[in-house]
A protein has these predicted regions:
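Nucleotide/phosphate-binding catalytic cleft detector across ATP-hydrolyzing
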Residues: 1-79, 94-176
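Short, glycine/acidic-enriched loop or turn micro-motifs at the edges of active sites
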Residues: 19, 85-87
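Short beta-strand scaffold segments in enzyme catalytic cores
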Residues: 80, 87-92
Length: 176
């Protein structure tokens, strides 16, 4: 139980883009671990990376944590591709600064949108099709999303490298 591991936890850091999750984890941290958590993305949370984005804008805590971890593990000149609800591309320069990125719909979100917004299209799971050209609706949808995402990732990474005019390492993470 949580009470049995209480003595082993002295600090808590929360990184979530879902307000309800942040709230619940704060309550859990306070109630079971008697500690006030650090919430990434809140004004009182200092991160060990320079965030260079337009004034008045915010970067999701998941993206900041990815950038800090990526830089710590692999250094600068890094593109971090996170496959989640959204597919994000975050860029860390040679000095370790977060310099921006790209947000695209996630793989499963795209499949869900096809099913929900196009009445005749069924729900399908992501799968690598045997051939690019599908011969039924499910195979066509799977091909479009599977190969479309490969194209999306390759092209966005290529354009970032072209724009930065530097060699970049590419790191993939996420849970789809």
């Amino acid at each position: 139980s949580l009470q049995n591991i209480k003595a082993d936890i002295s600090d808590v850091i929360i990184s979530s883009t879902v307000p309800r999750v942040v709230f619940n984890l704060r309550v859990l941290s306070d109630r079971y671990f008697n500690t006030r958590p650090i919430v990434v993305g809140k004004p009182d949370c200092k991160v060990p990376i320079d965030v260079r984005v337009d004034a008045g804008t915010a970067v999701g805590p998941d993206r900041i944590v990815n950038s800090v971890a990526g830089y710590d593990l692999f250094g600068g000149n890094l593109i971090i591709v996170d496959f989640g609800t959204a597919t994000t591309f975050d860029v860390v320069d040679k000095d370790g600064a977060y310099v921006g990125g790209v947000i695209a719909p996630g793989v499963n979100l795209s499949l869900q949108a096809l099913h929900q917004m196009a009445a005749a299209l069924p729900h399908v799971d992501i799968a690598r099709p045997k051939e690019v050209i599908g011969t039924n609706t499910v195979a066509c949808m799977q091909s479009g999303v599977f190969w479309g995402y490969i194209g999306l990732v390759k092209e966005i990474c290529r354009k970032i490298i072209e724009e930065k005019q530097e060699g970049m390492k590419i790191l993939a993470t996420g849970g789809l």
